[in-house]
């Protein structure tokens, strides 16, 4: 049995903050008591705040480590360990790592099979290397013709807990202002003006062909498998009403 005692802490409870002591036994909270502990070996937190671990539902931080620059791919094990260290340092003990599937423009990591990260998560967790608990949040790009295909390797893995539905078609939601989309794609993505205008012309047709069929498929899948479902970049009351429906 492993036991730790944290004392002289400002312990954040559900309805108050108390100066007290927390006893941990085999990785679980055994007791929370007011006052200081005189037990030898108790760790004095000197009045620091002691909070429950945070739960992060949506972070792109893992993707950032896997591809720190456009078209630059980092080894998955090193990327996950760096990401995990940052997450733990921020007080996050449970993280839903967001991984995008599907790219209407067929470029970047989201246009590729990224499911190898699942095996890396399992490997590092089994080795006791990871500090935080990692689940997977799959972000489904609805206008992408390859969204379902790239989702398939994740579909039945026990780490999959959350799906969110995205549509980054220029002219609506996040890209309601076309000029903002232009700055992003020509700046961060390195597109030429000609490529941006070309993709802008194709986007409505791609959306009309794939977005609704993919939406229905992913919603049905989430409901059938008991997965949490979220929407993305809702910017109007109509978007919220659509999400609730």
Feature names for model-found ranges:
Residues 1-38:
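N-terminal metal-binding scaffold of metallo-dependent hydrolase/deaminase domains
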Residues 9, 27, 47, 58, ...:
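Divalent metal-coordination and catalytic microenvironments
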Residues 36-51:
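Active-site metal-binding motif and surrounding structural segment of the metallo-beta-lactamase
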Residues 69, 149-151, 241-243:
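A short acidic, amphipathic alpha-helical/loop segment
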Residues 102-234:
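Metal-coordinating catalytic core of metallo-dependent amide/deamination hydrolases
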Residues 223-226, 237-245:
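Acidic, glycine-rich loop-and-beta core segments that form the ion-binding/anion-interacting portion
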């Amino acid at each position: 049995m492993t036991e730790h005692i944290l004392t002289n802490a400002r312990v954040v409870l559900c309805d108050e903050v108390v100066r007290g002591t927390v006893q941990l036994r085999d990785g679980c909270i055994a007791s929370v008591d007011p006052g200081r502990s005189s037990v030898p070996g108790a760790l004095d937190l000197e009045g620091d705040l002691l909070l429950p671990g945070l739960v992060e539902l949506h972070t792109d931080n893992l993707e950032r480590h896997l591809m720190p620059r456009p078209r630059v791919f980092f080894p998955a094990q090193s990327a996950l360990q760096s990401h995990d260290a940052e997450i733990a340092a921020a007080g996050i003990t449970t993280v839903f790592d967001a991984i995008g599937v599907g790219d209407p423009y067929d470029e970047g990591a989201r246009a590729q099979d990224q499911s190898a990260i699942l095996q890396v998560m399992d490997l590092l967790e089994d080795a006791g290397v990871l500090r935080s608990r990692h689940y997977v949040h799959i972000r489904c790009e609805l206008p992408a013709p390859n969204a379902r295909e790239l989702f398939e390797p994740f579909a039945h893995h026990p780490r999959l807990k959350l799906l969110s539905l995205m549509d980054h078609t220029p002219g609506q939601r996040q890209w309601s202002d076309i000029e903002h989309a232009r700055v992003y794609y020509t700046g961060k993505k390195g597109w030429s003006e000609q490529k941006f205008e070309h993709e802008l012309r194709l986007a409505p047709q791609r959306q009309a062909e794939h977005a609704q069929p993919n939406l229905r498929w992913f919603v049905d899948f989430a409901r059938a498998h008991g997965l949490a479902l979220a929407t993305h970049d809702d910017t109007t009351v109509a978007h919220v009403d659509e999400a609730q429906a």
